[in-house]
């Protein structure tokens, strides 16, 4: 973990209430897909944790949904604006633990970290396939970006306005060895009830400090209490008490 002063290179809407934020600066602390940044927003006491969608040697891309005052303020920031962030937080996905074919299942904004994971899987010679769930067509994002990587991608919407009608569990692809998922807890529970394949689950939680000191994001696991910000956000599916 390091503290970095990032410069906004891009901050633009990509779907209903969802923005893509590209930051330029030091990314050396980012070592795995599924990690996150904790952004300091002026006027707000707590930092805002946002999962990493993609990164390279000079920039990091985040996707976020406007859900309150902090993210509303963030959505108004323009290129050139400086943001203070704690970078490279959390325990990310273990690419080596993924099978030859890995199902990436994302729900809403939980799709974000799976894009970076897809790129890492491809770089490791593995085959990711994606099933992404949204409420309606206006909410869909990154379908084309996944497909541009050559990833077989299926979209499910609750109202049937785009792709398969229903949820990610209604659109599961048949052939995969492992599963990696991120999204709302009901989606994750339903997914793990539908398939018994080994996998990794990225949990969403409210956080205080973002680096394990405050214990505010603790969950109960089969191995006792664990911090989503420190031991997570990615856990083995077998660790989670559903």
Can you say where each PLM-predicted feature lies in the sequence?
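Short microdomains enriched in Cys/His and/or Lys/Arg
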Residues: 233-242
């Amino acid at each position: 973990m390091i503290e970095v002063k990032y410069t906004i290179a891009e901050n633009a809407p990509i779907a209903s209430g969802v923005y893509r934020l590209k930051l330029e600066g030091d990314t050396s602390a980012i070592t795995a897909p599924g990690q996150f940044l904790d952004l300091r927003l002026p006027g707000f006491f707590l930092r805002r944790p946002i999962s990493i969608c993609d990164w390279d040697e000079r920039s990091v891309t985040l996707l976020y949904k406007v859900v309150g005052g902090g993210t509303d303020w963030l959505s108004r920031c323009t290129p050139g604006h400086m943001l203070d962030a704690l970078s490279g937080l959390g325990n990310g996905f273990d690419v080596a633990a993924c099978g030859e074919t890995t199902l990436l299942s994302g729900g809403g904004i939980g799709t974000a970290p799976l894009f970076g994971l897809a790129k890492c899987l491809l770089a490791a010679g593995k085959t990711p396939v994606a099933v992404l769930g949204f409420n309606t067509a206006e909410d869909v994002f990154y379908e084309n970006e996944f497909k541009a990587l050559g990833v077989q991608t299926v979209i499910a919407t609750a109202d049937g306005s785009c792709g398969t009608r229903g949820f990610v569990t209604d659109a599961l692809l048949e052939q995969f060895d492992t599963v990696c998922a991120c999204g709302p807890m009901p989606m994750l529970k339903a997914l793990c009830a539908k398939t018994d394949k080994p996998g990794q689950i990225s949990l969403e939680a409210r956080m205080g400090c973002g680096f394990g000191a405050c214990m505010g994001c603790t969950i109960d696991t089969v191995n006792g209490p664990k911090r989503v910000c420190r031991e997570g956000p990615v856990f083995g599916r077998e660790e989670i008490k559903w």
